[in-house]
């Protein structure tokens, strides 16, 4: 069993997210809460670098070691870092409960040490007609982020 934690920080945005995985090849469970968001849907992704030295910008692009197009968490063709959308209620709080079978805390494509990012807008899963739909889901600005750390 491997467990990790992410302390999300941003301008008015904060939260705590945990990741747990029994063994390599088993599903990963991602749970937590993020507050300070505008009500509605927000894209959530793991980005390639574990670097928040310049806020969330220094985290790089979506984590995509298999060089696939952006997609939804249910798509076979997707970035490993594509976690879809979280929904903030009218109080600005989003509760996260995700089971994912692509992402891993084990092996060569582990997300450990990388940055989880919450975006200002809804992820269009690569289905929009925007220039950044196929690469970033047209999810908007990075409003909060934190490094995935082993616990």
Curated annotation (Swiss-Prot):
An annotated Gene Ontology molecular function: copper ion binding
Biological role stated in the UniProt entry: Destroys radicals which are normally produced within the cells and which are toxic to biological systems.
Entry annotated with the keyword Disulfide bond: yes
Lineage: superkingdom: Eukaryota
InterPro entries per the UniProt record, alphabetical: SOD-like_Cu/Zn_dom_sf (IPR036423), SOD_Cu/Zn_/chaperone (IPR024134), SOD_Cu/Zn_BS (IPR018152), SOD_Cu_Zn_dom (IPR001424)
Assigned keywords, A-Z: Antioxidant, Copper, Disulfide bond, Metal-binding, Oxidoreductase, Zinc
Name of the protein in question: Probable superoxide dismutase [Cu-Zn] 6
The protein's enzyme class: oxidoreductase
Species for this entry: Dictyostelium discoideum
Cofactor(s), names only, from the UniProt record: Cu cation; Zn(2+)
Cofactor binding: number and manner: Binds 1 copper ion per subunit. Binds 1 zinc ion per subunit.
List of residues binding Cu cation: 45, 47, 62, 119
Annotated residues for binding of Zn(2+): 62, 70, 79, 82
Catalytic activity: 2 superoxide + 2 H(+) = H2O2 + O2
GO terms of biological process kind: removal of superoxide radicals
Pfam families, sorted: Sod_Cu (PF00080)
Protein family membership: Belongs to the Cu-Zn superoxide dismutase family.
SS bonds (residue pairs): 56-145
Cross-referenced SUPFAM superfamilies: Cu,Zn superoxide dismutase-like
Enzyme Commission number, as recorded: 1.15.1.1
